[in-house]
Amino acid sequence: MPFIANTDDDRRSMLQAIGVGSFEELIPDIPSEFCLKEALSLFPSMSEMEVASLLDRLASANRTSPDYVSFIGGGAYDHYIPAALKTIVSRSEFYTAYTPYQAEVSQGTLQAIYEYQSMICRLYGMSVANASLYDGATAMAEAVSMAMNVTGRSTVLVAGKIHPNTSAVLKTFIEAGGKASVVQNVLTDGVCDIAALESRMSDQIAAVIVQQPNFYGCLEDVEAIGALARSHGALFIVSADPVSLGLLNAPGRYGADIAVGEGQPLGSALNFGGPYLGIFAVAEKYVRKIPGRLVGMTKDRDGEDGFILTLQTREQHIRREKATSNICTNQALNALQAVVYLSLMGKDGLCQVAEHCLQKAHYLADKIADLPGYSLRFAGPFFREFVVNTPVDASVVVNTMMEKGFFAGYDLGIHDDSGLLIAVTEKRSRAEMDSFVENLGAIS
């Protein structure tokens, strides 16, 4: 269908219908200096062939992980994605990012989501998982909102170092609305200071949040943190990396009330930041408080198994003010990628991926620590990524190593921090890591 722009008469008619004199009256909150005063300088009209050629040239300026040896982490990881995954998720029956509204005629999609929920429950050790949320940060914000609704309290305590972007989303969701405050606890050697956390606990704390492994890759004392949360009636929220659960204890095993996570490592490509996958699971007693969509199994009138959307306490179905959340969709395609990834890898395969990440990260960390001018910032145990003190500013290291064919890591200076956050996945070979160390050693 062709696009036909509105004419001046069309615009005047619409403005008159809503009782407005000009378009500018509709956007008074936008400062005038940010409004266009003249037409945009756009490309001249092009044919389809010319547009394709232009886009190819623009795209060629990008530098992506297949072109470099990547050690970037910080929430998005260069894991191997099995070839069969793309073939399966590209089937036309599955290829949608949305949960079907006509659930009765979309049994295949609903079953895939049901299997995803079941696998997430097993992986995280929880009783109920939803059909996914937008990403890990959104899942964390929804977990905090749920905790406040459950407890009636208004303060959230961050026990360790969570991703700064997640922290920003929390502030937008929670603090911007004037509903609550988010308090960051003190860190010692990169992890939560348990004594400081205990001193901050009170009966006004709605939830205690911990990321495991934390943003720095360090492993937190989740048992002690969870015990403190429970002793004050606060909900215990754990943001756990799904790949790490191939080796680490599941959040449900150490008493998490809500478990969330970023599902990107489970078969989703890096994709310049998205779309990703928000994992969200809860203990059984909170099943009616969980946000997002839930797929359940039932029997049809013929006694056959069937799948439905159930417990739909969202704003589409009930009054907005009574909804558990205004999140009313999910990342169906990414959830499908996750369930296909987990199915292809199997329990043993996921454990092997986690083991490779752990061993290779420690191999590289030991090699880098031996270089003059370099040192590990933290002494405690870590999984897959670690922070390195560098002899020059981390941004210099990143730019120099890029010229050598490496994505050297995540410059923590972006977040007013220091050091280089380096991640190692199962894809990295010994030869790549040795070459990386050799090139790092030339920077001083």
Swiss-Prot record:
Keywords: Oxidoreductase. GO terms for biological process: glycine decarboxylation via glycine cleavage system; nucleoside metabolic process. The glycine cleavage system is composed of four proteins: P, T, L and H. In this organism, the P 'protein' is a heterodimer of two subunits. It is an enzyme of class 1 (oxidoreductase). It comes from the Bacteria. This is Probable glycine dehydrogenase (decarboxylating) subunit 1. The glycine cleavage system catalyzes the degradation of glycine. The P protein binds the alpha-amino group of glycine through its pyridoxal phosphate cofactor; CO(2) is released and the remaining methylamine moiety is then transferred to the lipoamide cofactor of the H protein. Signal peptide: none annotated. The keyword Oxidoreductase applies. CDD domains: GDC-P. NCBIfam families: PRK00451.1. GO terms for molecular function: glycine dehydrogenase (decarboxylating) activity. It holds the Pfam family GDC-P. InterPro entries: GcvPA, GDC-P_N, GDC_P, PyrdxlP-dep_Trfase, PyrdxlP-dep_Trfase_major, PyrdxlP-dep_Trfase_small. It catalyses: N(6)-[(R)-lipoyl]-L-lysyl-[glycine-cleavage complex H protein] + glycine + H(+) = N(6)-[(R)-S(8)-aminomethyldihydrolipoyl]-L-lysyl-[glycine-cleavage complex H protein] + CO2. Its EC number is 1.4.4.2. Belongs to the GcvP family. N-terminal subunit subfamily.
